[in-house]
């Protein structure tokens, strides 16, 4: 009777010691994993934001180069001070289809770069956004062959203007049209710089999409 009364009064219930230790020892790895993930997240965001800033600066430089190339070529014209009754010696960019294509291609590239600036800023503000970054990657990749083709076609004409072709009896005209050749040569150089900047932009977007 005494033993049963003492058991009811105290209400002692045996608790297994091993289960309490295992339940208390489980949480620390979970806490450590959460701390590791939260530490990694700001680091990745910082890298992506830095790549976004580089992307924005490169686009500003590419805009300047593309518009400079299109403007220099589109305003190129030279007329020699001497002419005859039947002939007028004048060189104009639209006399050659390659130069016309050059102006159109670089103007399109410059317009696209201007329109892409808001999306580049969006990638800086929201570094983990994928849609805008993927869209920029696709259009930048399309712009690379467009600008490269225009610059290469114009470069071949500039080479003939400087050196001529004896097999085809094409004479070099840059001795007479010196100003014309200097302007178109500068435009071609600016266009190749634009193409190079587009290649770098594609690489930056690819790295930003790959970084996790």
UniProtKB/Swiss-Prot annotation:
Quaternary structure note: Homodimer and heterodimers.
Main location: membrane
Transmembrane segments: 50-70, 101-121, 134-154, 187-207
Function: Regulates membrane-cell wall junctions and localized cell wall deposition. Required for establishment of the Casparian strip membrane domain (CSD) and the subsequent formation of Casparian strips, a cell wall modification of the root endodermis that determines an apoplastic barrier between the intraorganismal apoplasm and the extraorganismal apoplasm and prevents lateral diffusion.
Segments on the Extracellular face: 71-100, 155-186
Pfam families per UniProt: CASP_dom
Membrane topology term: Multi-pass membrane protein
InterPro entries: CASP/CASPL (IPR006459), CASP_dom (IPR006702), CASPL (IPR044173)
Species assigned in the record: Helianthus annuus (Common sunflower)
GO biological process, alphabetically ordered: cell wall organization
Name listed for the protein in its UniProt record: Casparian strip membrane protein 1
PANTHER family the record matches: CASP-LIKE PROTEIN, CASP-LIKE PROTEIN 1U1
Subcellular location(s) per record: Cell membrane
Cellular component GO terms, alphabetical: plasma membrane
Keywords: Cell membrane, Cell wall biogenesis/degradation, Membrane, Transmembrane, Transmembrane helix
Residue stretches of biased makeup (Low complexity): 16-28
Family: Belongs to the Casparian strip membrane proteins (CASP) family.
Ranges facing Cytoplasmic side: 1-49, 122-133, 208-212
Renumbered residue ranges of the record's region Disordered: 1-28
């Amino acid at each position: 009777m005494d033993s049963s009364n003492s058991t009811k009064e105290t209400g002692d219930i045996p608790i297994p010691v091993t289960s309490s230790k295992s339940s208390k020892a489980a949480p620390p790895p979970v806490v450590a994993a959460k701390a590791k993930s939260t530490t990694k997240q700001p680091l990745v965001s910082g890298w992506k934001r830095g790549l976004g800033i580089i992307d924005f600066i490169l686009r500003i430089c590419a805009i300047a180069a593309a518009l400079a190339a299109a403007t220099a070529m589109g305003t190129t014209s030279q007329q020699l001070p001497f002419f005859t009754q039947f002939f007028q010696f004048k060189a104009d960019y639209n006399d050659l289809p390659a130069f016309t294509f050059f102006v159109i291609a670089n103007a399109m590239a410059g317009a696209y770069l201007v329109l892409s600036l808001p999306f580049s800023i969006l990638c800086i503000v929201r570094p983990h956004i994928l849609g805008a970054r993927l869209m920029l990657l696709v259009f930048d990749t399309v712009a690379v062959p467009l600008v490269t083709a225009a610059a290469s076609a114009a470069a071949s004409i500039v080479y003939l203007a400087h050196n001529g072709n004896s097999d085809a009896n094409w004479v070099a005209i840059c001795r007479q049209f010196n100003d014309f050749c200097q302007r178109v040569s500068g435009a071609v150089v600016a266009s190749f710089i634009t193409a190079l900047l587009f290649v770098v932009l594609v690489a930056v977007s690819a790295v930003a999409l790959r970084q996790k």
